Each structure stands twice: as structure tokens, then as C-alpha cells.
């Protein structure tokens, strides 16, 4: 018998393709969770239009509306509180998550990064891989900590880097692998099959 569904918030800044893939996997019953609120820092982000048919509350919390980082982070916490979320999914969220949020939801915030961490953290992971001359790159789903893409790694998958790759072609090749990897990682999280010991995430499946 499955446990009750995990209540999840999704944070997104962009087009929301990973978020949509996760939402569909929940609707199909693959992931034992449900998005109960969407938070974006851009009112014109793609996720706003993409999620209209989901019938999920969407809240815009724009950093420019707050006079300090602390008040911005508090607004995020205040927005989440009524929804009693069990976890937060970052899907193309382009801001560093604040300390308050990390402390409140320790080991409950998941992120996907378009490179094989710990290599190529930060922005432009695809281009960093091309510039670095690596022959294989991939994506990493990890728990979020206070560093830049430094949290414990849940799962990774790979794709080849081709000699004529551009940032766009590599991004297009990696995207379906990102969807697959994030869906599987979130499934495990929602079924309480991830255990963290130090820097290592152990999977029970």
C-alpha cells in the first residue's frame, strides 16, 4: 500500500518543461506526489502559461519587489506555509535558494543541473562542458544545500558531447534525459527511498 501523496511546491523561473514532465508523471501515477503551489520569480515566465490547465495556485514573488534578500526569502516562506509542503522542486529556478528556506526544508529541496556535478556548476553547464572538452556530460539531480550546486547527489545520467555541438544542440539532446532523471529521482523521494549519510545519498528501491 502506497503512502499518502507528498505535497510539493515547484519553483520555476523559465519555460517549465521539467515541471510539466513531472506534473504529467504525477497525473499518470508514476510519482506519488502532487504539486500544490507554483512559485515563480517572473510573472512572464513560461511556467505561468504552461501551468494554466493544471488548476494549481501560482504565486509570483519577484525579487525586485523586496528591499532586501531577507524580506524576499521571508515572503517565500510565508507563501509556502499555508500549503504545508513536504518538499520543494526547483525546475529551472534561476536564483540561489536562501538560507532560511534551506534550513526550514533541509534535505527536502531537489534541483536538477545540466552537467555532471561536481564538474561545471553554476550557469551555462552545457557550454562549460563543451569548452572543457569533455566527451560525456549529463545531468544531476541533487538535494540543495547552501553552496552553488554542491548538495548531495541523488542521480545522474549521461549523453555524449559531439564535436560539432553547440550549447543549443547539447541542451536539446540532454533535455529528455533530464526529464527521465528528475522523474525517477522525485519518485524515489516521494516514496521515502532516499537516505543521506554525509555526502552520499543511498537509494532503497
Predicted feature locations:
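Amphipathic, non-transmembrane alpha-helical secondary structure
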Residues: 20-24, 49, 74-81, 183
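Proline-centered loop/turn at the N-terminus of a beta-strand
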Residues: 7, 34-37, 57, 108, ...
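Short, surface-exposed acidic-centric catalytic microdomains
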Residues: 33-74
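Short, conserved catalytic or interaction motifs in soluble domains
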Residues: 13, 63, 114
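Donor/substrate-binding cores of folate-linked one-carbon enzymes
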Residues: 25, 87, 91-200
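N-terminal Rossmann-like dinucleotide-binding module
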Residues: 2-46, 50
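Short, basic/aromatic-enriched C-terminal tail that caps enzymatic domains
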Residues: 20, 196-205
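Short phosphate-binding loop-to-helix
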Residues: 64-95
Amino acid at each position: 500500500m502506497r503512502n499518502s501523496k507528498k505535497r510539493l511546491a515547484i519553483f520555476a523561473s523559465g519555460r517549465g518543461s521539467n515541471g510539466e514532465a513531472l506534473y504529467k508523471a504525477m497525473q499518470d501515477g508514476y510519482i506519488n506526489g502532487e504539486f500544490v503551489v507554483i512559485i515563480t520569480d517572473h510573472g512572464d515566465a513560461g511556467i505561468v502559461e504552461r501551468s494554466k490547465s493544471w488548476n494549481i495556485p501560482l504565486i509570483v514573488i519577484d525579487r525586485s519587489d523586496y528591499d532586501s534578500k531577507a524580506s524576499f526569502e521571508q515572503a517565500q516562506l510565508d507563501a509556502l506555509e499555508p500549503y504545508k509542503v513536504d518538499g520543494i522542486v526547483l525546475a529551472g529556478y534561476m536564483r540561489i535558494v536562501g538560507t532560511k528556506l534551506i534550513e526550514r526544508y533541509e534535505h527536502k529541496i531537489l534541483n536538477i543541473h545540466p552537467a555532471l556535478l561536481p564538474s561545471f556548476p553554476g550557469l551555462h553547464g552545457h557550454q562549460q562542458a563543451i569548452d572543457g572538452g569533455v566527451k560525456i556530460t549529463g545531468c544531476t539531480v541533487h538535494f540543495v544545500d547552501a553552496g552553488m550546486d554542491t548538495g548531495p547527489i541523488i542521480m545522474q545520467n549521461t549523453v555524449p558531447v559531439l564535436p560539432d555541438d553547440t550549447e543549443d544542440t547539447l541542451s536539446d539532446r540532454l533535455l529528455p534525459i533530464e526529464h527521465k532523471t528528475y522523474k525517477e529521482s522525485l519518485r524515489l523521494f516521494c516514496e521515502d527511498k532516499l537516505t543521506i549519510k554525509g555526502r552520499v545519498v543511498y537509494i532503497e528501491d
